[in-house]
Design a protein with these regions (language model features):
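Acidic, serine/threonine- and proline-rich intrinsically disordered appendage/tail regions
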Residues: 2-9, 17-31, 39, 123-169
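Short beta-strand elements of extracellular/lumenal beta-sandwich folds
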Residues: 30-58
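OB-fold and OB-like beta-barrel modules that bind single-stranded nucleic acids
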Residues: 47-49, 97-98, 111-115
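Short acidic, flexible loop segments centered on an aromatic residue
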Residues: 56-75, 112-116
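Intrinsically disordered, low-complexity Pro/Gly/Ser/Thr-rich segments with frequent PxxP/GP/PP motifs
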Residues: 74-104
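Short glycine/proline/serine/threonine-rich loop/turn segments at secondary-structure transition edges
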Residues: 103-112
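Short acidic/polar inter-strand loop motif in beta-rich domains
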Residues: 105, 117-124
Length: 169
């Protein structure tokens, strides 16, 4: 009987303590990825922004801004560099993709994007964070890329035409 009483007390204590938990505020993990293998002048570059809410409440009024790509060096082909997402529920994610086209070749420093959000419905002040930083990347000239990766059809046709006389004899 004494063991039965101890088990009942432990169960009542466990039930009483689990009901008092507060929901943790929203906390966003933010990453920025460049999806292209080669960065080429005049060709599209795909950039993916991923947000994941690891908190216990929804993140509200999420604003993503990336000031890395100036209009003098890059043209925005698809998507937007400044985006607002109304809410990201707890345990879920949101992604955004931007397609840009570089107008110059050379080395370029891809810096972090910025996110700001309200961690709960009652928060008065927005939290500000930064994404992961892809770092420095080389944008190669289109001529160099074309020289390496073009199918060289004209070269193969001229080779075939020059080797035909020796095969016919």
């Amino acid at each position: 009987m004494d063991n039965w009483l101890k088990i009942c007390i432990v169960v009542v204590f466990a039930v009483a303590t689990t009901g008092n938990e507060e929901a943790t505020p929203a906390k966003l993990l933010f990453s920025k990825q460049i999806l292209n293998k080669y960065l080429v002048e005049g060709m599209d570059i795909v950039i993916k922004y991923s947000l994941f809410n690891v908190g216990g409440t929804a993140a509200l009024d999420v604003q993503v801004a990336d000031n890395t790509f100036g209009p003098q060096d890059f043209e925005v082909v698809g998507g937007q560099l400044k985006v607002t997402i109304d809410r990201i529920p707890p345990g879920s994610n949101a992604t955004h993709v931007v397609v840009i086209r570089p107008s110059k070749y050379g080395y370029f420093n891809f810096t972090a994007a910025e996110v700001s959000y309200l961690p709960s419905e009652y928060a008065a002040e927005a939290l500000v964070g930064l994404s992961s930083e892809p770092g420095q990347g080389a944008i190669v000239p289109f001529k160099e890329y074309d020289r390496k990766f073009s199918p060289h059809l004209l070269d193969w046709l001229s080779f075939a035409a020059m080797s035909m006389p020796s095969l016919v004899l």
